[in-house]
């Protein structure tokens, strides 16, 4: 039999093992896995390379429309492809207007036409002002709903994102549970974090360590505990976003042991950066929850290897450089990171700490696809989309600003020596990024809607 594509001689990450085996693709799908698969129009030799499922990044901010000067579909999805991401799940905030109903999500679809290098699923927003319109987003096909119990949004802009209070969260979660949807939550105690931050500013405490102290671990843990209880009472699946502390992970683990339907994610920056590095890097490493100390980081690695964290995500949330000016307490909080999720974590988790390749595949792709119902994504298996990434192990390089595809070529990882490289990214059987030839085909990404799964 003749196929469109055969990948030969690579070490392939399968669900429960990794071994040297060939992959055949036909019509954008994985058609066969094995040896001596026959002929193909295109044959790629992956000798010495790891062949991974394309990353499913379940937490990405593309600020188009309305704030395209922060990040746009063209630049953001090219960076994703260069970093081995083949599917992103896009957050409903940072763009203007926020994605809170049918009209605003249609604006996203229109803005992205002809610009998607990778595939994209959408999240709707659960905000203080759209409880009567959640069904519109469900009908369009979002794969989940994001909300904040921490303070968010520009109060001077009417159609910006807004956090929810406990009543709004509970009522929204009730509605979403009835729709068989998942609610995703940014968990920090709004009032305490706000007051601690204002107190620090008044007293002139504006260093990285001061910022971290203004958002202590207990503010994350309290919020996680609260939304777990409310989501359970409301009858809604819960996904806890970007957990930064082992104590926060323990709350999720405890709830799972009590048979609550809950999952969680974390981000590479919580595993590879610490507060001292944050102080050195400056505002480019500011995010919330904040990057914490080495002892906290050690605990996060233990939770990751124990299987208590479901997936790793970028939380890519860039902004124009001028918004990172000034002291750390004043600067915008958000990290530009999606281009370096896979290579950094392959280096740190697999090469330096001995994580198995199947576990790496689950954390970067499989689990996120399962959590959000992306049935064609996240696995190297017959019938799945042929979304694949070639990783060259033990191949060190120093990340430079000019390597970045973002609209603004800045990242807290610039200057870092990374011990692995993404050499090729394949989306539905077509090479969309190659380390030698760049981006060889026009953007072919498409939106993934829940009801089409």
Swiss-Prot record:
Residues annotated to bind Zn(2+) 2: 146, 186, 242
GO molecular function, one term: cobalt ion binding
Cystine pairs: none
Record field: catalytic activity: (S)-allantoin + H2O = allantoate + H(+)
The EC number(s) this enzyme carries: 3.5.2.5
Annotated positions binding Zn(2+) 1: 59, 61, 146, 315
Subunit structure: Homotetramer.
Family, similarity comment: Belongs to the metallo-dependent hydrolases superfamily. Allantoinase family.
General function of this protein: Catalyzes the conversion of allantoin (5-ureidohydantoin) to allantoic acid by hydrolytic cleavage of the five-member hydantoin ring.
Name of the molecule in the record: Allantoinase
Gene source species: Salmonella gallinarum (strain 287/91 / NCTC 13346)
């Amino acid at each position: 039999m003749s196929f469109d594509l055969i990948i030969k001689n690579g070490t392939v990450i399968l669900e429960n093992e990794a071994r040297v085996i060939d992959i055949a693709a036909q019509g954008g799908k994985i058609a066969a896995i094995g040896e001596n698969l026959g002929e193909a129009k295109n044959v790629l030799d992956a000798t010495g390379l790891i062949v991974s499922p394309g990353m499913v990044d379940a937490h990405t901010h593309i600020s188009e429309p309305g704030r395209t000067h922060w990040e746009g579909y063209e630049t953001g999805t090219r960076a994703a492809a260069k970093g081995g991401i083949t599917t992103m799940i896009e957050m409903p905030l940072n763009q203007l207007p926020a994605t809170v109903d049918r009209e605003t999500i249609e604006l996203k679809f229109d803005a992205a036409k002809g610009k998607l290098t990778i595939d994209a699923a959408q999240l709707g927003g659960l905000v203080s002002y759209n409880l009567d319109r959640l069904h519109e987003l469900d009908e369009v096909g979002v794969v989940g709903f994001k909300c904040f119990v921490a303070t968010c949004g520009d109060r001077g802009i009417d159609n910006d994102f807004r956090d929810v209070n406990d009543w709004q969260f509970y009522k929204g979660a009730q509605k979403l549970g009835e729709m068989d949807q998942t609610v995703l939550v940014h968990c920090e105690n709004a009032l305490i974090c706000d007051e601690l931050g204002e107190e620090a500013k008044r007293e002139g405490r504006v260093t990285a360590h001061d910022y971290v102290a203004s958002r202590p671990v207990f503010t994350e843990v309290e919020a996680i505990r609260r939304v777990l209880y409310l989501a359970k009472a409301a009858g809604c699946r819960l996904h806890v976003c970007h957990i930064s502390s082992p104590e926060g992970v323990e709350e999720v683990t405890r709830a799972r042991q009590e048979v609550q339907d809950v999952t969680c994610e974390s981000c590479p920056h919580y595993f590879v950066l610490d507060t001292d590095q944050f102080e050195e890097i400056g505002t480019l490493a500011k995010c919330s929850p904040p990057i914490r100390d080495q002892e906290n980081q050690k605990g996060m690695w233990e939770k990751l290897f124990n299987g208590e964290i479901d997936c790793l995500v970028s939380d890519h949330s860039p902004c124009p450089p001028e918004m990172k000016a000034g002291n750390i307490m004043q600067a915008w909080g958000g990290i530009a990171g999606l281009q370096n999720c896979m290579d950094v974590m392959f280096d740190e988790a697999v090469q330096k700490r001995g994580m198995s390749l199947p576990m790496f595949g689950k954390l970067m792709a499989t689990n996120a696809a399962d959590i959000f119902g992306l049935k064609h994504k996240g696995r190297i298996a017959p019938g799945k989309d042929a979304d694949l990434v070639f990783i060259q192990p033990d191949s060190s390089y120093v990340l430079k600003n000019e390597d970045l595809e973002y609209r603004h070529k800045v990242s807290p990882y610039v200057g870092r020596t990374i011990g692995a490289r993404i050499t090729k990214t394949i989306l539905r059987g077509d090479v969309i990024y190659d380390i030698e030839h760049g981006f060889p085909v026009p953007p072919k990404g498409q939106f993934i809607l829940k009801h089409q799964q």
